[in-house]
Amino acid sequence: MKEFIIKANKTVTNGEINLKDLPGSSGRLDLICRCVNSAFFLSHDLRRDTIFYSVLYGPPNPPIALQFVGNELKRVSPDERSIALFIKKALEKDASELWKESTSGIYSSKWEFRDIILKKKNEGKRIFYLHLNGKPLENFEFKNDEDFVFILGDHIGIGEEDEEFLEEIGAEKISLSPLELHADHCIILVHNILDKLK
């Protein structure tokens, strides 16, 4: 199982989304939509072995955590507008500590970024923090019988406090490239590496 968790610092936390201006009025919701696309969409199928989380910290009601479960997703198209519509529907639900399903395979809750990561850590999953200044990918060994969790930041990053938190819990800091990459491109690169283990 592959899981991705991204912290979205400015993305709105209600359903008032302007589908014509995802980057501006919705706090870079376009970036999250592209990450969903990269996490799941193949040429003629979906990745069923993947779960994607985005924890939104924009106004007016942060945090809102969104969960996309690959083996449950239905009717989602790969374009940003379609994905944004499904996110809009999820954000229109009243979020609580319990995960609530808005459409097949898409859930929302009031879980915090750190709480989701701690849950994965307690489940015994291997936690990686994708960062430009991490150790080169070539220095890590991946086994196809392991469960992996990859932490990403948006265009702002995750912030110093959350970086310290990841260090405290023993997350492995990994770099995919000597260049700074978009989060959605990082997801594709991770998939490519792990696909080769099969």
From Swiss-Prot:
GO molecular function annotations of the record: S-adenosylmethionine-dependent methyltransferase activity; tRNA methyltransferase activity
Self-association and partners: Homodimer.
UniProt EC number: 2.1.1.257
UniProt record similarity statement: Belongs to the methyltransferase superfamily. TrmY family.
Name under which the protein is recorded: tRNA (pseudouridine(54)-N(1))-methyltransferase
Residue positions binding S-adenosyl-L-methionine: 130, 153, 176-181, 186
Primary location recorded for the protein, binned into one broad class: cytoplasm
UniProt entry keywords in alphabetical sequence: Cytoplasm, Methyltransferase, S-adenosyl-L-methionine, Transferase, tRNA processing
NCBIfam families assigned: PRK02135.1
Compartments it resides in: Cytoplasm
A GO term from the CC aspect: cytoplasm
Gene3D superfamilies in UniProt: 3.40.1280.10
InterPro entries cross-referenced by the UniProt entry: Alpha/beta_knot_MTases, TrmY, tRNA_m1G_MTases_N
HAMAP family membership: tRNA_methyltr_TrmY
The keyword Methyltransferase is assigned to this record: yes
Function (record text): Specifically catalyzes the N1-methylation of pseudouridine at position 54 (Psi54) in tRNAs.
GO biological process: tRNA methylation
Gene name in the database record: trmY
Reactions that this protein is recorded to catalyse: pseudouridine(54) in tRNA + S-adenosyl-L-methionine = N(1)-methylpseudouridine(54) in tRNA + S-adenosyl-L-homocysteine + H(+)
